[in-house]
């Protein structure tokens, strides 16, 4: 079986995200979702997550894909993953992240590889049509200071000092 995925969002977005991904890829196995609706709290969400986990094969790990960092779905999932190996919470869930993560699971990647892929495709999936892509910041070479003449100074020559700092701490 593949790595388990649980989608958690505010409102009914989690169910719709899963339906959208399944519309593109077909039905997915070892996946569940929880919605956080008014009147619920973190304890309710933890109960929902734990109930969903009982129906999933978690032997290879679980990735919680949630909407926002610090939101209730994130906080509840964070409390579940704290003492478990191969459990992770990723925020910013979107359709490209889901689609790529589901497709990659078919290739049986390692847990860390799937987490990295979800993060990368989630970021790359957010774009603007007309905005120019930011160019990678290239370090600008510092202009070289003008070179002083290499010839020794004669007694008639004078040194020009532009700035001087006197430090009386010594």
What are these language model-derived features?
Residues 47-59:
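N-terminal small/polar loop signature for handling phosphorylated ligands or for N-terminal nucleophile
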Residues 1-3, 60-61, 85-86:
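Short coil/turn segments at beta-strand junctions that form active-site/ligand-binding loops
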Residues 2-3, 8-48:
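N-terminal intrinsically disordered, cationic/polar leader segments
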Residues 73-84, 103:
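Short Gly/Thr/Asp-enriched flexible loops that form oxyanion-binding sites at enzyme active sites
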Residues 104-134:
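Short, glycine-/small-residue-rich phosphate/pyrophosphate-handling segment
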Residues 136-170:
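Intrinsically disordered, low-complexity charged/polar segments
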Residues 83-101, 114-115:
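Short, acidic/small-residue loops that bind anionic groups at enzyme active sites
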